[in-house]
Amino acid sequence: RAIGRNSSLDMLPSKRAEFRSRGRFLLKADVIRFYPSIYTHSIPWALHGKKFAKLNRGKELLGNEIDELMRNCQDGQTNGIPIGPDTSLLLAEILLTQVDQKLSHRRLKGLRYIDDYELVFDTEAEALAALSKLEEALLEFELHLNPSKTKVVPLPQQLEDSWAAELKSMELLPGSHKFKGQLIRFFDRAFELARSFPTENVLKYAAGRMARMRIWIYHDEMAEDLLVQCARVEAGALPAVLASILRNPKRASRRTRLLKELLHSIIMEHAPQRHSSEVAWSIWACLALRLKLTSRVVRPVLQMEDSVCALLLLHARALGLLHKPKDLDELQAFLTPQDLYESRWLLSYRRHPRLE
């Protein structure tokens, strides 16, 4: 990424141990639908002050210019900014740093990781009072806490999710003769934990641990089969699964039938639900593995009206990976200058190298 973080998720348990030693009650809270609910007009409020920005709406203010650019990215909508780009991460920090600033006089103990808050207090009353002030500070920027994830609990509490701690502690030694048995036990437990914690990304975590291994472990098809199962059940695990499988492209190319079935099934399942990330990763994997896309797979992707997925299809056509290249002819309609300001502006912007 172009923008990094000072702390990774792996560092959270040790940081929690440090600040939780300073109180008896823990306030946990996060912002509901954070990126989709960001009000673009609040960007100049955060950069220049709310009162000043409301009195000065011209482009001479950087915040107003960013506000307009964000609206142009979202079909003119004032609610929501794109999820994923580093620019959005930076804008999120600009907003929530101002929220932090409004609370700084209270000398709070704890941390904020993106939009997740964990703060400690000596008494429950202090925690509830701080919760009220946090809600008030967020409301100034049109943001709200998620009531289902906001709570005050007595300390001590677990430093990390029990399922994550268990999977992290399981031994996996790729160079050992015991590795095959370790692998079976690891994924058996991961599948069991995924059923016990259906709202958590258990299989994504399991696949991610495999992807971080430095030694090539795919001498055995079983490892690949287990990873494919993870992606079939939890499509969010697909990037980590692909990172593992594509580490050995020659081996991946020998299992094209299995991978084609996986990727096509993910596209067919998630395209009608407009799950852009899952579909985009699947199409990208087809490009990387040179797997052809049938009309049956392409049609629901076009109906998503998603520029990133459409551009990936155009790249597939350029590589000769579409069974029917004419399936994409309808994208020619998005070539007018006006389309640069509509919801599919990215497709229009990139039209020349792909459509002409």
Task: Report each predicted region and the residues it spans.
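Extended, Lys/Arg-enriched charged tracts that mediate electrostatic binding to polyanionic substrates
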Residues: 1-7
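Catalytic-core helical/loop segments in enzymes performing group transfer/polymerization on anionic/lipid-linked
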Residues: 9-11
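Conserved polymerase palm-domain catalytic core
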Residues: 14-114, 119-135, 141-143, 171, ...
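Conserved catalytic core of two-metal-ion nucleotidyltransferases
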Residues: 84, 141-172
